[in-house]
Structures are given as structure tokens and as C-alpha cells.
Amino acid sequence: MGLNDIHSLSHTKWNCKYHIVFAPKYRRKVFYQNKKVEVGKILRQLCDWKGVNIIEAEVCPDHIHMLVEIPPKISVSSFMGYLKGKSSTMLYEQFGELKYKYRSREFWCKGYYVDTVGKNTSRIAEYIKNQLKEDELGEQLTMTGMGPYKSKR
């Protein structure tokens, strides 16, 4: 933890970093090409509006990893409610076809994963950077060796 990691509000010094993971409802693989780029822009814009700093982020086809600094005046749960609520509205505005896939107008899964980041910020940032590669490798491993004429052993 360096001096650059400590921020201040009036009468408060803080260093609040979180690793957050959330996914579209039904874990659908929707983030490809222009949707991947646009959801990144939307999340960046929403974080800027709330004063949340994105240290590292990766948009995978079926989930999103973010390493963020959230000021202590904002709770993680209220930030995630805001982020998921506003981003789903903005995604529906840009990509009208999503309304038909998600009829209940709930784009994101109900929950999310959050973990506090202590002194291992760089390690978690590296993990998030490599997440897309890991997902692709995992998909390749599950697809190899399977076929209609091969046993599951």
C-alpha cells in the first residue's frame, strides 16, 4: 500500500478497494463486439458519476470483473444497485433486442460477488486482466474430447 492508495474526504482518509463480479441474468453470453465495448463505456461513465475509480476491469462474454475504489460514503450494496439498475436501462436503450431476451426488464442476476482487496491489489488486477484468457481456455478444455461417439470416461 503506497501513499497514492490513500484518498481523502473531509476529515476522512480512506483506501477502500473491492473486487466485484456480476453477470447477466441466466448467465447468458451477450457481451461480444459492440456490446462488450458499449457496456464498458456505460460502466465507466456510471462509475465516474459516483466518484468510483476503476483500477482494472474485464468484460467476459457472460460476466464482468471490476477492481474498484469506492468512497466510504457509498456502501457497496447501494453502489451495485445503482450500477446494475442504471446500466440495464442504458443497455436496453442502446440495444432494443435485449428487451425480448429479458422480458422482466431485469438484465442482471440478482446477486453479485464482492471481496475486499488488501495489500494484494496488483495480484487481483493481474487476475482480472487474464480472466478473459482463462475463460477461453476453460471453454476449450470442456469442449475437447467430447463427441457423439466418445464415452464420458
Report the location of each language-model feature.
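Basic nucleic-acid-binding interfaces
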Residues: M1-R153
